Amino acid sequence: MALHAAVKGKLISVIGDEDTCVGFLLGGIGEINKNRHPNFMVVDKNTPVSEIEECFKRFVKRDDIDIILINQNVAELVRHVIDAHTAPVPSVLEIPSKDHPYDASKDSILRRAKGMFNPEDLVR
């Protein structure tokens, strides 16, 4: 009889407004780790910037998270912390919210990724 070890996948985390978080939670991404820490944070107009920064830093340090989704308007509040994160994992993706459309010109991660490729290499 062979024993099979169950391999658990990595998580997606979300930092965003209530609608964004609820949407992703309904999609099944909600998890609480062994220390009872969730993989999401709901941000509203009363959330202190320091709390958002600490949450982002916690998500970056967690070894069970591979992707951090963050509303772009929230990312603007903690841009210096996001820009300081240079490791490929967890990947940080800025997403639109219901009230704030995505603006590629504000996405520093996208600009950094574009700088990694030579446009001439993509044509071939």
Swiss-Prot record:
GO molecular function annotations of the record: proton-transporting ATPase activity, rotational mechanism
Keyword Ion transport: yes
Protein name: V-type proton ATPase subunit F
Domain of life: Eukaryota
Pfam families from the UniProt entry: ATP-synt_F
Gene Ontology CC annotations of this record: proton-transporting V-type ATPase, V1 domain
Transmembrane residue ranges: none
Keywords, alphabetical: Hydrogen ion transport, Ion transport, Transport
Gene expressing this chain: VHA14
Quaternary organization: V-ATPase is a heteromultimeric enzyme made up of two complexes: the ATP-hydrolytic V1 complex and the proton translocation V0 complex. The V1 complex consists of three catalytic AB heterodimers that form a heterohexamer, three peripheral stalks each consisting of EG heterodimers, one central rotor including subunits D and F, and the regulatory subunits C and H. The proton translocation complex V0 consists of the proton transport subunit a, a ring of proteolipid subunits c9c'', rotary subunit d, subunits e and f, and the accessory subunits VhaAC45 and ATP6AP2.
Function (record text): Subunit of the V1 complex of vacuolar(H+)-ATPase (V-ATPase), a multisubunit enzyme composed of a peripheral complex (V1) that hydrolyzes ATP and a membrane integral complex (V0) that translocates protons. V-ATPase is responsible for acidifying and maintaining the pH of intracellular compartments and in some cell types, is targeted to the plasma membrane, where it is responsible for acidifying the extracellular environment.
Organism: Manduca sexta (Tobacco hawkmoth)
Record-stated family: Belongs to the V-ATPase F subunit family.
Family annotation (InterPro entries): ATPase_V1-cplx_f_g_su, ATPase_V1-cplx_fsu_euk, ATPase_V1_fsu_sf
